[in-house]
Amino acid sequence: MTFVRNAWYVAALPEELSEKPLGRTILDTPLALYRQPDGVVAALLDICPHRFAPLSDGILVNGHLQCPYHGLEFDGGGQCVHNPHGNGARPASLNVRSFPVVERDALIWIWPGDPALADPGAIPDFGCRVDPAYRTVGGYGHVDCNYKLLVDNLMDLGHAQYVHRANAQTDAFDRLEREVIVGDGEIQALMKIPGGTPSVLMAKFLRGANTPVDAWNDIRWNKVSAMLNFIAVAPEGTPKEQSIHSRGTHILTPETEASCHYFFGSSRNFGIDDPEMDGVLRSWQAQALVKEDKVVVEAIERRRAYVEANGIRPAMLSCDEAAVRVSREIEKLEQLEAA
């Protein structure tokens, strides 16, 4: 499969990393991720150049990653710094590939492509995750589907009415107001739900209030698969800027052609010190992401080989505009790298 390699992807959450290496495959590339004694995260190819043992099974010795097989040691840049055998020679062939890493917004970003092109300024903004005006709860999930299926799912805001009916269904669905905005390296899908009864989830945000409300469900896409959702609610007629809202992290990183990593979070501007609201959002994440979206996209993945082998093309609905635009942008990025 063709992956877009010259881009920033999330490899891990900060709490996943310590001096014990984490092995994780990204874009069919095995990585060893670990935090060095100075706190800086290192990412090395998870293959020792000697006999190809996984370095993620090793340990840190004096700040260096030691291979579990023959004891070669590597610094965070991938250079072999110790060879315990023979005369201790360390030719260039003993060095291992390292990858650019940036820790930002409580996310570990990695650049799997040409290191010379790795510009930290191109990392999309997820500052709400560390903004003291917000409270963030989230986590990591593994999904057995091609990452593009989840991109389609997330950019299609209308699916919530059916897939997430237990929590997000609205009686104002027939009055939805939609807009798609295309910017420089960014696509937004905006949806307003005017004058409806609060959904089950929104009612929890409002502490059980049941008066007519306006609600919003927006999402922003940045290459290649980083999305920031905005769900909000306010009494009918209230400006969007005065709503209570949650900004949702939805970042997908391909693992293989048929699996991906899902980094998610909800950053809210209300009930910041309320552990009960933490529970509401964790329950929503477990239900919507694990029990609902995951089930749907994994079922589609199991049919993907048949669909592709038989040249079946998807029928289009009016709600597909944002997802289709994003799909085309990803195709352009793939073609650009392949050229």
Curated annotation (Swiss-Prot):
Activity profile over pH: Optimum pH is between 6.5-7.5.
UniProt-listed InterPro entries: Cholesterol_7-desaturase (IPR050584), Rieske_2Fe-2S (IPR017941), Rieske_2Fe-2S_sf (IPR036922), VanA_C_cat (IPR044043)
UniProt-listed Enzyme Commission number(s): 1.14.15.-
Leading EC class: oxidoreductase
Protein activity control: Activity enhanced by Fe(2+) and Mg(2+) ions.
Impact upon substituting D293N: Loss of O-demethylase activity
Biological process terms in GO annotation: catabolic process
Cofactor: [2Fe-2S] cluster
Site (Plays a role in the stabilization of the metal coordination): N153
Residues engaged in binding [2Fe-2S] cluster: C48, H50, C67, H70
Every Rieske domain range: 8-110
Domain of life, source organism: Bacteria
Summary of the function given for this chain in its UniProt record: Component of the dicamba O-demethylase multicomponent enzyme system involved in the degradation of the herbicide dicamba. In vitro, catalyzes the O-demethylation of 2-methoxy-3,6-dichlorobenzoic acid (dicamba) to yield 3,6-dichlorosalicylic acid (DCSA) via an exocyclic monooxygenation.
Protein name as it appears in the record: Dicamba O-demethylase, oxygenase component
Natural source organism: Stenotrophomonas maltophilia
Gene: ddmC
